[in-house]
């Protein structure tokens, strides 16, 4: 019962999708085929044509119809007519010719992809003045064998009168969103079709491998589907010049000094309700005088908005320039503007008391109802909702939440009890935003306790005790849901949220909810009875078939999904799509070549309870690493699974758990958490053959990347930089050990002479402390203001490189036996992490959007609705276990579920109806398919799904 964006009505061979926006009715006549390819044994074919209307930029299909089949001919004559309502600017028609087969799949005979922007329009005074055109049939891929032509007639119906007027009369009597167009196939008169206009200078027409025509602009290196014209190019250049002039005028206007006079906003004509604009205040420092500027509110109609030049001229006439202005004039102005005072009360009070403070300038920012001031809700090209913060010009996938932020810091600029309502934002974990500990008292302090704390931290970098000098003690606490005990979230002056840990008296930019392992971020699953009330404007009702559905009276739509389960805190962070990474990955896969002189597959038969040692012996016994590039074939003892990708994915998952387990002493957790891994510098004390094991781990990592699988583990960022041979900097220390980072940063920004530091480090091993010189005779060289940068570089080199150099070399030896290191270097350290380990978070919305259904299931089927409700009610750990149960891995590819791979290439997550309600669900990991019985109640589905996920182990059949 989701809202309809397009309705489709076939009627007497007529197909009219009703699309909102600028649209026209297109008459298409499939006349005949000429000299088609021979596909049948007896030298003929049974051709028919399939017509697909789709959106060019999104490749989203809007309508699909086909002609009748003409038997045993290579020159069929269909003479069938269709009508489409299209948007000429971004719609295209795809004609595909097939040879019908009763027993096997229909053979492909060719295709034609036609843009709709330059088709002619019929003249009502003449009868069918448009003529046919023969289109060359093009192949779908390089393997397609096609020939011949497709003869078509295409023209737009006139905009006024005729067919569309009749349709508008019929449409008044019908339900909204549907339209009927009569089919009328009469004789046509031929006339010569005008050739398309010439391309502008610098443009080129090309055809892609699907036979679609596109146009290349060599001037600005862009491509597009619709044919450009000289008028488009000239208007584009005019727009660019106009935009440059507007920006210049805007800069000139902003550089002027204005004093605002008492301007009352004019009410909109006709009682129109204005757009939801809010007035926010922004402090502006201008040397010399204290100046204020009040802009008039924008008009209600978007079409009447003025340009910056007009705005500048209007304000120049209405504003007065007064050289001896003061804060009292501005204060009185704000008091006469109650709407402005509500949003800038604290600033106004400060101006009233201190005349020398600069007054705020008032700006108008578009605000979406229900969001904090300055926030706007938008949708991207893929239909995903995101939020724009006009206050600090940032965007986020997470909906901002309104909460009161109490400022308890001393020395505030305002003495008023009124405070701005600021949004509290839960942002997804950024791949390149390590933990930053704010330590203003530490940086500016000169007393001996601070110096002693810095020296203690440097002498023992692995100390887990936090420094008490990192942040002032707040006077107020604001409790927020989902945060760990003792944590608080606030907003910095630049609008960026930061987090306060009252347990250790530290602050950080990174969300503490994302510092825990994925499976620990939510302790328990949700209960359907504990979801709370529905959002404002929503209503819950029962359908005739007994199912519950929900009505949104705000937007007048209905849906099956519970809106309370669409909270980003429940669905998970959105997947950040990266087109650049996709291009690099495709290039990387093309360069990987499988040797010709190796077996068809590399087999391993293992026991689950001894997977680490058996895998080590089997892989290290291979003398020629190229053999590992053959297809992996994994078998677990006493299991009958046939490995077509799923068993291998589970092998990588299980082996990762063992290899990276700190119990074996090869890796250890980093200083800041218990899930990010780093190489253990003392691994040789735990295992004499540790270098051989690191070579084995390198081979496994290379195997995973070569075969497109993912490892289950996170490493610190310097680990990936060492793999790429990049220089490790002080900023890399920040995400690993923030306390040690703060100490080194303090040295960098201050004179360290008084600390009495030497070019040596105290290292503690098993209770004993050893002194390590950073350079020869380092214990005799003092750290001064002149050599402090060299000291910091040596500390970082020792901390991340020197101690683990042998282990890293062994790891790279195994890794480069399968993958050339030069090919890996096309990625940066962030992309290399995604290449090896993928994403750990599960975005349920992305998961649901890229799922397909078979054997009677569809998105609105009750069982499918219950399934996704059960997934949304799961905690993060159970979602990952469900993903691992169906796909064999707990990781998600870089660009989300759209890039899931199966045994034969890309394979979306699939749910197929199977079995009876008494059976448990079963999975086929090689096909990413879940066989889900048609359960009769939600409780039954949830119980049996969890039972299958938590208790199933092993393979049988094809996986």
UniProtKB/Swiss-Prot annotation:
GO biological process per UniProt: cell differentiation; neuromuscular junction development; protein ubiquitination; receptor catabolic process; receptor internalization; regulation of dendrite morphogenesis; regulation of sodium ion transmembrane transport; ubiquitin-dependent protein catabolic process
SUPFAM superfamilies registered for this protein in UniProt: C2 domain (Calcium/lipid-binding domain, CaLB), Hect, E3 ligase catalytic domain, WW domain
UniProt domain WW: residue ranges: 197-230, 369-402, 481-514, 532-565
Alphabetical list of PROSITE patterns matching this protein: C2, HECT, WW_DOMAIN_1, WW_DOMAIN_2
Regions of compositional bias (Basic and acidic residues) in chain numbering: 444-455
Regulation: Activated by NDFIP1- and NDFIP2-binding.
Record-annotated active site: 926
Domain HECT: start-end pairs: 624-958
GO MF terms, alphabetically ordered: sodium channel inhibitor activity; ubiquitin protein ligase activity
Entries under InterPro entries matching the protein: C2_dom, C2_domain_sf, E3_ub_ligase_SMURF1, E3_ubiq-protein_ligase, HECT_dom, Hect_E3_ubiquitin_ligase, WW_dom, WW_dom_sf
CDD domains: C2_NEDD4_NEDD4L (cd04033), HECTc (cd00078), WW (cd00201)
Summary of the function given for this chain in its UniProt record: E3 ubiquitin-protein ligase which accepts ubiquitin from an E2 ubiquitin-conjugating enzyme in the form of a thioester and then directly transfers the ubiquitin to targeted substrates. Inhibits TGF-beta signaling by triggering SMAD2 and TGFBR1 ubiquitination and proteasome-dependent degradation. Promotes ubiquitination and internalization of various plasma membrane channels such as ENaC, Nav1.2, Nav1.3, Nav1.5, Nav1.7, Nav1.8, Kv1.3, KCNH2, EAAT1 or CLC5. Promotes ubiquitination and degradation of SGK1 and TNK2.
Name of the protein described by the UniProt record: E3 ubiquitin-protein ligase NEDD4-like
Source organism per UniProt: Pongo abelii
Lineage of producing organism: Eukaryota, Metazoa, Chordata, Craniata, Vertebrata
